Design a protein with these regions (language model features):
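A residue-level signal for conserved active-site and pocket-lining positions in enzyme catalytic cores
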Residues: 31, 63-64, 96, 106, ...
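Mg2+-dependent endonuclease catalytic cores in nucleic-acid-processing enzymes, primarily RNase H-like
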Residues: 107, 115-215, 236, 240-242
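ASCE P-loop NTPase helicase motor core
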Residues: 1-51
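Gly/Thr-rich phosphate-binding beta-strand-loop-beta motif of the actin/hexokinase/Hsp70
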Residues: 86-110
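Conserved beta-strand scaffold positions in the cores of enzyme catalytic domains, especially
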Residues: 26-30, 92, 167
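Charge-patterned, long linear interaction tracts outside catalytic cores
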Residues: 219-243
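ATPase catalytic-site recognition across NTP-hydrolyzing enzymes
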Residues: 37-95
Length: 243
């Protein structure tokens, strides 16, 4: 549903999947095998029905021509919307950096190890921020709570620390992305209801190939920040942390 065609011709106009008719000068014509059942063999129909039972999401997309709510081969399916940190657990933060095209992000996390739940809240998703901007946002949101950030930016981390943010860089190593993903997949992820940019990333962060541990380098700005802080807590600061 992130495709520009969906955004322009469906979402912006309030057009539902499967609609037929003319809206704002655009003709919508949607047909499926259900409109031609009389001319199909029993075997073809049985194949379609079997897919409907076995994989309803794929059936709705491939057979009925609907738009996917999440990308094919998406990495994370173990998440839902919910209240953030209802039990008052310790909150710490992850941060990733961009500038012009890539967003700067700040993600709050509370981890319930006994219930295997990670509570997640989006605090920042914005491009074009300078060091002072980041410090001000971090100070307002986090106070003196810990931030684990992208260690590829040591100068920026040092500057934010000198200004007063309680911030440190993550550790990196071979296989760190896969390790971080595995940690997140082993927990239930509960996303605060207004964290829409993280939801978009969770719905679109995908494997590069089926059966591989390689990931498409896109839709990952908040998820990188999430990996930094969860790996710090769940892998231990003495072990490899994710990028």
């Amino acid at each position: 549903r992130e495709h520009w065609v969906y955004k322009r011709f469906f979402e912006s106009k309030g057009v539902r999947d499967g609609s037929n008719g003319s809206i704002d000068g655009v003709n919508y014509i949607h047909t499926t095998y259900l409109d031609n059942v009389a001319n199909l063999s029993k075997g073809v129909i049985a194949t379609m029905e079997r897919m409907r039972v076995d994989d309803i999401d794929n059936y709705n997309n491939v057979i009925l021509g609907g738009w996917r709510a999440r990308a094919e081969g998406v990495v994370f399916t173990n998440w839902r919307f919910g209240d953030f940190n209802p039990d008052g657990l310790q909150v710490t933060y992850g941060q990733d950096y961009g500038f012009k095209n890539d967003a700067n992000t700040l993600v709050g996390v509370a981890i319930d190890k006994s219930k295997k739940i990670i509570y997640i809240q989006e605090h920042l998703y914005q491009t074009g921020l300078n060091t002072h901007d980041l410090y001000t946002i971090n100070n307002k949101v986090c106070g003196r709570d810990l931030i684990v950030a992208d260690s590829a930016e040591p100068r920026l981390i040092s500057e934010l620390s000198s200004k007063g943010n309680n911030i440190r860089g993550c550790k990196k190593g071979p296989g760190s992305i896969s390790a971080g993903v595995s940690i997140l997949q082993s927990y239930e992820l509960v996303l605060e209801n207004n964290s829409k940019n993280i939801a978009t990333e969770l719905n679109n962060y995908a494997y590069a190939d089926k059966g591989s541990n390689l990931f498409v380098d896109d839709y990952n700005h908040s998820l990188d920040a999430l990996r930094y802080i969860t790996s710090f807590h769940l892998m231990g600061s003495s072990k490899i942390e994710v990028r």
